[in-house]
């Protein structure tokens, strides 16, 4: 299936079939998608919680209480549930972790190339954390890049998913001790196979026309 067909076919799943699980291979593939998403300057300011056990999914679903109870069954019935978390502050320890990993992966021919790469990343990191004072917002944007990449990727694997912002982040952060670890939850994405109750699976896709959303120059 070509990428345009995938984009046209995927939809936000409103109900999952709890009896259908990801295969072990698919479970590994979705983790690879998370790992290899693009991010600004390859900063990767994220962490993911992947819940596949009933206990794990129930812990995530605690955040779908009160005003968000309509999302609870999605979290409980999906095969896997991914919590996308962003770093709350960019620090030099993380930047060193990134450049050292790039070095270990063979991206630099010389020490000078590594130093230049590190300097360039720190320029943008410092611009956001010291000049614009919006590093938290900048890092959240990178996580959303990952979410978009992930949604298209899981659809290409023949899986169904739905991005959820309707959850109590304070409850979820507390449940997993995210604040203490320097993260906060942004998006929850259940993944699995839609059920016959998923009304959205049979509805036509609707988007604004290109003459409204696109300008060619």
UniProtKB/Swiss-Prot annotation:
FMN binds at residues 10-14, 71, 165-166, 205-207. Its cofactor is FMN. One of its GO terms (cellular component) is membrane. The keyword NAD applies. Transmembrane segments: none annotated. One of its GO terms (molecular function) is NAD(P)H dehydrogenase (quinone) activity. Subject to competitive inhibition by dicoumarol, nicotinic acid and acetate with respect to NADH. Subject to uncompetitive inhibition by dicoumarol, nicotinic acid and acetate with respect to nitrofurazone and nitrofurantoin. It comes from the Bacteria. It catalyses: 5,6,7,8-tetrahydropteridine + NAD(+) = 6,7-dihydropteridine + NADH + H(+); 5,6,7,8-tetrahydropteridine + NADP(+) = 6,7-dihydropteridine + NADPH + H(+). NAD(+) binds at residues 14, 41, 71, 74, 107. One of its GO terms (biological process) is 2,4,6-trinitrotoluene catabolic process. Keywords: Flavoprotein, FMN, NAD, NADP, Oxidoreductase. Its EC number is 1.-.-.-, 1.5.1.34. Reduction of a variety of nitroaromatic compounds using NADH (and to lesser extent NADPH) as source of reducing equivalents; two electrons are transferred. Capable of reducing nitrofurazone, quinones and the anti-tumor agent CB1954 (5-(aziridin-1-yl)-2,4-dinitrobenzamide). The reduction of CB1954 results in the generation of cytotoxic species. Homodimer. NCBIfam families: PRK11053.1. Belongs to the nitroreductase family. This is Oxygen-insensitive NAD(P)H nitroreductase. It comes from Escherichia coli (strain K12).
């Amino acid at each position: 299936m070509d990428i345009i067909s995938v984009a046209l076919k995927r939809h936000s799943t409103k109900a999952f079939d709890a009896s259908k699980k990801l295969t072990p291979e698919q479970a590994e593939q979705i983790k690879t998608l998370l790992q290899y998403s693009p991010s600004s300057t390859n900063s990767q300011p994220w962490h993911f919680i992947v819940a596949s056990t009933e206990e794990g999914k129930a812990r995530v679903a605690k955040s779908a209480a009160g005003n968000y109870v309509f999302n609870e069954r999605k979290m409980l019935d999906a095969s896997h549930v991914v919590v996308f978390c962003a770093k709350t502050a960019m620090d030099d320890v993380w930047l060193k972790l990134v450049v050292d990993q790039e070095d270990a992966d063979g991206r630099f021919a010389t020490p000078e190339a590594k130093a230049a790469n590190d300097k360039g990343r720190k320029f943008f990191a410092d611009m956001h954390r010291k000049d614009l004072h919006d590093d938290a917002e900048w890092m959240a944007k990178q996580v959303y890049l990952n979410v978009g990449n992930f949604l298209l990727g899981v659809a290409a694997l023949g899986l169904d998913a739905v991005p959820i912002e309707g959850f109590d982040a304070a409850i979820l952060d507390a449940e997993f001790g995210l604040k203490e670890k320097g993260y906060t939850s942004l998006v929850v994405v259940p993944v699995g196979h839609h059920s016959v109750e998923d009304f959205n699976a049979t509805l036509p896709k609707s988007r604004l026309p290109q003459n409204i959303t696109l300008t060619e120059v």
